[in-house]
């Protein structure tokens, strides 16, 4: 159902002004905006516009300078399929039962919930997927999404478009940046990693992917300008989840759910705006639907980013469930200062076996070696423990890297109680199943460590040529050891 867009345009203008994202007055005849939604795969806020010194991302920086940069933006899940399922529907993945990554049991969405592109298509938008880049959608449901084109150039005259594109360079198939290689000695590592040459080089290689992605994003934005579409197009740039490094993707720490969020809309969003509100990716869905003048059949879970309501938000929520064949479950609630994590399966290691991570994360191999050698610091060894604490609490102002669990401290107990209550309320509202008996039977929790010290050392050596390859040098990641994995049987740890 279409809303009266003329009234909505004026409403949005007023809300934007109250939100300090200034707008120029628009008449009731103002056309509905085009929407270009760009997703970076598997990377967080390690961009120069967010303060990272070693990386060079001029096109993304320019986008930030021409619009608004959000400093507290989050996904609802720390992995692509569940995060994208939420973004494609405007509803938390646990509410729509799309919360299991790489599930074999995909179903139709609950009654009344329909994909955002389909709603926009029905409202008269040309809905384009890919636009020359990745067409990844990766949803955990069977409904048709409603994309009607491959590029915004296929729209009819005067037809507004919604385009979703994915820049997949940052996914773990990393190339080297031949034009602007990053010196590993210039990067800043999180304190939960040991400072080793291989980890430094792995981190620098990741930052180079952002530089490569930046070049592609620059071409997309230039194409928008060349087509004369800049002024009436809302451009949104986000990450689909956090960085693909240990303690990042697949986990509810900041490294897994904190993402960049930049928006540009000339004449509506004031340039060089920085917003510290708590926002998540569902808010983008709500904003888009409102701007398009669409009334969804089921109320969306997000808030309009241009509303006063969002400034009053106290908490954001995130959840992690099955990752490939790895069974684990965690829930998190975050305020502006604190994060509370509830580990629903604390008896399982953070680093229980996961083929994807063991296959693609050189840093994880180093962590396993040093953990078994006993050479990690306490803040580094926490993530390698054989069990998790049932609860975690972090003061993000004092401890932005989340290395000091305050759950048993006396001072923040009122905060803990409030966060527990908020999380439980959210779980109830989402009809969150938590951990079922069937789910608990999955995975390989007893197989930890997943390999012997000798085996992990051999894997580090195999990763070495790939990680340290020179720009332009063609060396594939060492997949040959994965066939050996499954696993070191606990009775045969000497292998």
Give the positions of each predicted feature.
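Formylglycine-dependent sulfatase
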Residues: 2-391, 400-421, 428, 434-435, ...
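Extracellular, beta-strand-rich glycan-interacting domains
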Residues: 396-398
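A glycine-rich phosphate-binding loop feature that marks nucleotide/adenosyl-phosphate handling sites
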Residues: 439-444
């Amino acid at each position: 159902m279409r809303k009266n867009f003329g009234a909505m345009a004026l409403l949005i203008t007023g809300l934007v002004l109250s939100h300090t994202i200034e707008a120029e007055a628009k008449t009731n005849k103002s056309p509905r905006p085009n929407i270009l939604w760009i997703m970076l795969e598997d990377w967080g806020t390690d961009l120069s516009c967010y303060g990272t010194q070693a990386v060079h991302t001029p096109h993304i920086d320019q986008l930030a300078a021409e619009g608004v940069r959000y400093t507290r933006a989050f996904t609802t899940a720390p992995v692509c399929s569940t995060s994208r399922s939420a973004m494609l529907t405007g509803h938390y993945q646990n509410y729509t039962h799309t919360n299991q990554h790489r599930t074999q049991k995909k179903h139709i969405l609950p009654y009344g919930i329909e994909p955002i592109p389909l709603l926009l298509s029905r409202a008269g938008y040309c809905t384009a997927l890919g636009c020359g880049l990745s067409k990844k959608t990766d949803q955990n449901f069977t409904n048709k999404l409603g994309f009607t084109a491959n590029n915004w150039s296929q729209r009819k005259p005067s037809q507004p478009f919604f385009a979703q594109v994915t820049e997949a360079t940052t996914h773990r198939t990393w190339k080297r940046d031949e034009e602007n290689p990053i010196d590993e000695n210039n990067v800043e590592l999180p304190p939960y990693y040991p400072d080793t040459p291989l980890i430094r080089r792995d981190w620098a290689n990741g930052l180079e992917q952002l530089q490569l992605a930046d070049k592609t994003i620059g071409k997309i934005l230039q194409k928008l300008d060349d087509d004369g579409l800049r002024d009436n197009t809302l451009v949104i740039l986000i990450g689909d989840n956090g960085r693909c490094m240990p303690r990042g993707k697949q986990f509810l720490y900041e490294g897994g759910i904190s993402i960049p969020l930049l928006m540009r809309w000339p004449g509506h969003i004031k340039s060089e705006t920085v917003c510290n509100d708590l926002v998540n990716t569902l808010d983008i869905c709500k904003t888009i639907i409102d701007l398009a003048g669409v009334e969804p059949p089921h109320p969306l879970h997000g808030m309009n980013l241009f509303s006063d309501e969002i400034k009053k938000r106290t908490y954001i929520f995130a959840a992690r469930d099955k990752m490939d064949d790895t069974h684990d479950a965690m829930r998190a609630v975050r305020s502006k200062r604190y994060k509370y994590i509830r580990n629903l399966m604390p008896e399982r290691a953070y680093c229980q076996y996961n083929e994807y991570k063991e296959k693609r994360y050189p840093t994880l191999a180093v962590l396993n070696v040093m953990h078994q050698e006993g050479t990690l610091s306490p803040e580094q060894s926490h993530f390698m423990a054989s069990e998790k604490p049932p609860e975690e609490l972090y003061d993000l102002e004092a401890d932005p890297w989340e290395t000091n669990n305050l759950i048993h401290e006396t001072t923040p107990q009122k905060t803990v109680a409030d966060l527990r209550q908020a999380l439980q309320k959210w779980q109830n509202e989402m009809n969150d199943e938590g951990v079922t008996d069937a789910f608990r039977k999955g995975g390989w929790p007893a197989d930890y460590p997943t390999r012997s010290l000798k085996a992990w050392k051999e894997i580090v050596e195999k990763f070495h040529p790939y990680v340290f390859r020179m720009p332009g040098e063609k060396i594939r990641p060492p997949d040959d050891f994965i066939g050996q994995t499954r696993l070191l049987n606990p009775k045969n740890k000497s292998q």
